[in-house]
């Protein structure tokens, strides 16, 4: 009897042991799936947090860029840029900054001189097919010495610079004075731009050195209407202004 009870007892123990092992195996097989699911959930949460932080950062950077642009635009509009001219002394080699002349410092003679210089540069540097060969050329002639005038004729007769070939009847130009600098009693440095009125509407920035004098002239009545005081340019040089 003892052997019989011992057999059933050992059988029950064997079944219990096998059942326990099976439960442990089921738990072990279930744990990797749960761990994997938890890892994906944590990873997804981290990605969402990172995305939200990135969106906030982009918004802050956009606001900063807008504010910076507005500040720069305000500073540029409120800041005044005045061109300056450096004059070199031919004897000593010393450099000096030439101060531009303000309107409050102008005398009557200087105002008159600036008027005639502007009139001269306008006639010489701008183009209008209506009066280029007549009034403009006559103005340059009456305001120039013979040497300066013939130098002008040689310039405009060059095919590379002749405005009648460049613009023909299709375009005109106008002058805008940017600054005046008086570097001697009879000499000015003038910064200006020549602006096209149509087509590409290009702008050509230039700088001219103009020396002048007032001399007695024998002129006709019609010529006196153009140059009534004997204003004469005895030196003229113009270059592109890249400043």
Swiss-Prot record:
Xref: CDD domains: VirB8 (cd16424)
InterPro entries: NTF2-like_dom_sf (IPR032710), VirB8 (IPR007430), VirB8/PtlE (IPR026264)
Keyword Transmembrane: yes
Alphabetical list of Pfam families matching this protein: VirB8 (PF04335)
Superkingdom of the source species: Bacteria
Descriptive protein name: Uncharacterized protein RP289
Organism name: Rickettsia prowazekii (strain Madrid E)
Bilayer disposition of the protein: Single-pass membrane protein
SUPFAM superfamilies noted in UniProt: NTF2-like
Entry keywords, A to Z: Membrane, Transmembrane, Transmembrane helix
Primary localization: membrane
TM region positions: 55-75
Cellular component terms (Gene Ontology): membrane
Compartments in which it is found: Membrane
């Amino acid at each position: 009897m003892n052997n019989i009870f011992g057999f059933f007892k050992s059988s029950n123990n064997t079944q219990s042991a096998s059942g326990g092992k099976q439960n442990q195996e089921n738990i072990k097989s279930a744990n990797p799936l749960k761990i994997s699911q938890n890892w994906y959930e944590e990873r997804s949460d981290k990605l969402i947090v990172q995305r939200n932080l990135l969106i906030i950062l982009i918004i802050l950077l956009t606001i900063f860029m807008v504010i910076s642009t507005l500040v720069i635009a305000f500073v540029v509009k409120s800041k005044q840029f005045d061109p300056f001219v450096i004059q070199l002394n031919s004897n000593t080699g010393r450099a000096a900054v030439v101060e531009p002349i303000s309107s409050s410092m102008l005398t009557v003679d200087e105002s008159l001189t600036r008027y005639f210089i502007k009139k001269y540069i306008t006639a010489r540097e701008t183009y209008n097919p209506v009066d280029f060969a007549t009034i403009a050329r006559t103005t340059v002639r009456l305001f120039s010495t013979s040497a300066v005038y013939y130098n002008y004729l040689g310039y405009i007769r060059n095919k590379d610079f002749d405005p009648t070939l460049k613009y023909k009847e299709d375009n005109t130009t106008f002058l805008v004075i940017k600054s005046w600098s008086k570097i001697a009693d009879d000499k000015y440095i003038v910064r200006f731009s020549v602006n096209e009125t149509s087509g590409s509407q290009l702008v050509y920035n230039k700088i001219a050195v103009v020396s002048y004098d007032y001399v007695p002239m024998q002129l006709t009545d019609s010529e006196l209407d153009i140059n009534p005081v004997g204003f004469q340019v005895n030196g003229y040089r113009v270059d592109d202004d890249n400043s």
